[in-house]
Amino acid sequence: MSHFADMKKKFDDNGITVFAYCVNGMGDDFTSEEIDAMFAQAKALGASTISSSTTLSVAQKLVPVVEKHQFTIAFHNHDQVDDPNQFSTGESILKGLAMSPWYRSNLDVGHYVESNLGPIEFIRQNHEKITHLHVADGQKNHGVEVPFGTGDTPLKAVVNLLKDNHYNIVGMVELEYRNPPGSNCAIEVRKCLDYLEQAMA
């Protein structure tokens, strides 16, 4: 655990706060030791939330553990709407959140649109259960992520919904499209931020 304590010190020394600790691959074969380690690592980093892509069945198994640790887990959604065990539709997300008062949504607005769903109403109705958004521009009908402003996700409406209503939701740029030739991740993230800042101006 000393590695995580060292990382927290580096973050602290540079004025960086860890909001969410992302743990993916949480499957049915996750051991109790691995689950306890996940919580210990998140706490050592000073995170307030664990973010994870997993299934409803795993979320159900985690209920007694999350109650023991009393720590928030925010589940990330994908566009696997044909699998009722996935966090994908509004209904499946809410079904998972109802399992524990410690459960929240890490809503990926790009994937939500790829599932042919509209994020605005879901955010409006469930903002108290959403810790953070993965902000990406996706294409309908199970498409892919594309540069901001070129897909089907109503990004301008999303960020202004948060701004105008003062929702306590963190927005995180998720860079999932391929970098254009001659560009890099730093340049593309800056483009994404510029797009969002202009949208809220």
Label each PLM-derived region with a short phrase.
Residues 10, 14-107, 113-116:
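Active-site acidic/histidine proton-transfer and metal-coordination neighborhood
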Residues 1-6:
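Glycine-rich, proline-tolerant flexible connector loops at the mouths of alpha/beta enzymes
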Residues 87, 94-107, 113-201:
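Histidine-acidic metal/acid-base catalytic patches
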